[in-house]
Structures are given as C-alpha cells and as structure tokens.
C-alpha cells in the first residue's frame, strides 16, 4: 500500500474513534502510529478533504468525525444535535450550527423544497440563510424549521 493510502486509512480509523477534539491531538496520534512528518496543516487539509466535522460524541464531547457516506441526511440523523439557534427577520430565516455542519443541514432543508415553503438555502461553515417561497408566511416557515430541529433546543 502506498504511503499516502496508509496515512489516509490511519487518519480515517482515528476519526472513527470519535475521541479527538483538536487537530494537535490527531497530529500526536498519527505521529505515534509512525507518520513522523505529519503536522497540523496536513491534518487540516485532510479534515477538509474527507469532509470531517466537529460534532458531539456519545459523551457529549466535541470531536472530529467523518460524515455519513452518501444519501440525503434525514431528521432522524444526528444533525439535530448540530443546530445551535434559529432566528428570522421579515425576509430570511437564519440557522446557526456547530462549525462545519451548515452545508449538511442546508442539504436536508433543500431536499424538503418548495412544498415546505423553502425557495432555497445558502450555507457557509456554521450559518444557513433560508429564503422562503413567499415573504408573507416567513413566521410559518420559521415554525416548521424550528419543529424540525426542536429536540436541539
């Protein structure tokens, strides 16, 4: 197996343990596995490459984790735990998430579509803008989105 493949496999195996809360902890663990040339910037690039996000593990600790493979996220997936706050004005709804989770949650919201009153979303790292299909019922859409993630509040 090529050296990069071994590094990628070791990196994925470490993240599956769901116990690393910082990039420096991942660097140390990889160095202990024999990857002595690894540094924080390489770990940062690998986290981005594999789409890793920080989320809460079963012990409620914020740790790096690989996203679930394929498929549209559902409301029964742990994404509910990643929503921090939902607010709105007269035109838009803003959803605040844990760092790195906004695009996954926006994908779920986009899959709901116009039938649920969502014209579209724009997601950054930890913020989602939701545009309703009509300006008037923004409060109704706000209530629907809040109910979708109500277990987070």
UniProtKB/Swiss-Prot annotation:
Name the record gives this protein: Arginine repressor
Chain ranges passing through the membrane: none
Organism, as annotated: Actinobacillus pleuropneumoniae serotype 5b (strain L20)
InterPro entries: Arg_repress (IPR001669), Arg_repress_C (IPR020899), Arg_repress_C_sf (IPR036251), Arg_repress_DNA-bd (IPR020900), WH-like_DNA-bd_sf (IPR036388), WH_DNA-bd_sf (IPR036390)
MF annotations from Gene Ontology: arginine binding; DNA binding; DNA-binding transcription factor activity
This protein's pathway: Amino-acid biosynthesis; L-arginine biosynthesis [regulation]
SUPFAM superfamilies, sorted: C-terminal domain of arginine repressor, Winged helix' DNA-binding domain
Cytoplasm in keyword set: yes
Protein family membership: Belongs to the ArgR family.
Top-rank lineage group of the source organism: Bacteria
Keywords: Amino-acid biosynthesis, Arginine biosynthesis, Cytoplasm, DNA-binding, Repressor, Transcription, Transcription regulation
GO cellular component: cytoplasm
Protein location: Cytoplasm
Job of this protein: Regulates arginine biosynthesis genes.
GO BP field: L-arginine biosynthetic process; protein complex oligomerization; regulation of arginine biosynthetic process
UniProt KW Amino-acid biosynthesis keyword: yes
């Amino acid at each position: 197996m090529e050296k990069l493949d071994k590094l990628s496999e070791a990196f994925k195996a470490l993240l599956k343990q769901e116990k690393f809360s910082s990039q420096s902890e991942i660097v140390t663990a990889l160095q202990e596995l024999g990857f002595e040339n690894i540094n924080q910037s390489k770990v940062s690039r690998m986290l981005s490459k594999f789409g890793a996000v920080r989320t809460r593990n079963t012990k409620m600790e914020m740790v790096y984790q690989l996203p679930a493979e394929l498929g549209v996220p559902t409301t029964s997936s742990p994404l509910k735990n990643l929503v921090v706050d939902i607010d709105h004005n007269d035109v838009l709804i803003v959803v605040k998430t844990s760092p790195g989770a906004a695009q996954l949650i926006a994908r779920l919201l986009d899959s709901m579509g116009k039938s649920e009153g969502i014209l579209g979303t724009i997601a950054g790292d930890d913020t989602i803008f939701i545009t309703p299909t009509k300006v008037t019922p923004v409060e109704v859409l706000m209530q629907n989105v809040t109910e979708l993630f109500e277990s987070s509040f």
